[in-house]
Amino acid sequence: MQISGRFAVAVHILTCIDYFQDSQNVTSEFVASSVNTNPVIIRQIISRLKAAGLVDVSRGVSGMRLSRPTESITLYDVYAAVESVKGKLFRLNPNPNPKCPVGKNIHHALGLYLDVIQESFEENLKRVKLSDIISRI
């Protein structure tokens, strides 16, 4: 599969921002301490979240805030914002042997099922709101 760790870290970042945004200045350094990673990695992901309209970033006192209510942010929104591989979750072998009956037909035979799996995956991500995650913290 082609889902990187950025997705889970992005959800962690958004959850952290929501949890702390009214009580303290939420900076990339602060979030990095919660994620237990380098602030540079956090800033790279925040840049993608900001470009997707999920986060507002201000220098100084206010730090980061969510751009929208948590009830209107889905896991699909987060996934679409941070995953660099757009499109297919599964990669098919680009060069199956066209002279072999299996190689010649594997893309058609397998591709249909993988498309259905991906569609189901994306629909499930759209059903889960950031508020659902936050309610479990």
Predicted features and spans:
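Short amphipathic alpha-helical interface segments
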Residues: 13-22
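Short coil turns linking two alpha-helices in DNA-binding domains
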Residues: 38-41
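A short alpha-helical element within helix-turn-helix/winged-helix DNA-binding domains
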Residues: 26-36
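Short alpha-helical segments that sit at the start of domains
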Residues: 1-14
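Beta-hairpin "wing" of winged helix-turn-helix
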Residues: 53-67
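Basic amphipathic alpha-helical segments that dock to polyanions
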Residues: 45-52
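Non-DNA-binding regulatory cores of transcription-related proteins
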Residues: 69-137
